[in-house]
């Protein structure tokens, strides 16, 4: 028997390629009715949404979802485990925080979630095909970007409020001028500093 929508979670990550800060994951359970309503409101992959549209969707998702949760893995965990394992850890943490028993997890992408012991299915481009995955993407993106922007005043000079940790030219120049912070992913910066100087 196929699992009901109320027991299916969509999970997605954001910030995988960033140089700074944690990788985030969202996990969302939606009824079929909630999925249709959110899609009608413009729900899609968070990367395709403007900041304003994404912010408008967040409370709609939180209200419509049967359950939702977030997880993260720190820059230190990324350096210790590698980005794939750390990303999976953030997804597992999000899924474990859901109060709803799950019969199936839909994972965005082509790689299965190795740490998840229950049934799962990968969905290529799931954040543009599956409402629950798209909703997870939006919640995770909004939460991560909000955190990084709040940290911008603490780590002044890196332009975090503009690039939220991604590897832009502004970020690269700041790293070369100021060096990495405690929240930078050192494993991501090896090539940059191999060319331009030591990683201190």
Swiss-Prot record:
It is an enzyme of class 3 (hydrolase). Manganese or magnesium. Binds 1 divalent metal ion per monomer in the absence of substrate. May bind a second metal ion after substrate binding. Keywords: Cytoplasm, Endonuclease, Hydrolase, Manganese, Metal-binding, Nuclease. One of its GO terms (cellular component) is ribonuclease H2 complex. GO terms for biological process: DNA replication, removal of RNA primer; mismatch repair. This is Ribonuclease HII. The keyword Manganese applies. It catalyses: Endonucleolytic cleavage to 5'-phosphomonoester. Belongs to the RNase HII family. GO terms for molecular function: manganese ion binding; RNA binding; RNA-DNA hybrid ribonuclease activity. Endonuclease that specifically degrades the RNA of RNA-DNA hybrids. Residues 6-200 form the RNase H type-2 domain. It is found in: Cytoplasm. It comes from the Bacteria. It comes from Prochlorococcus marinus (strain MIT 9303).
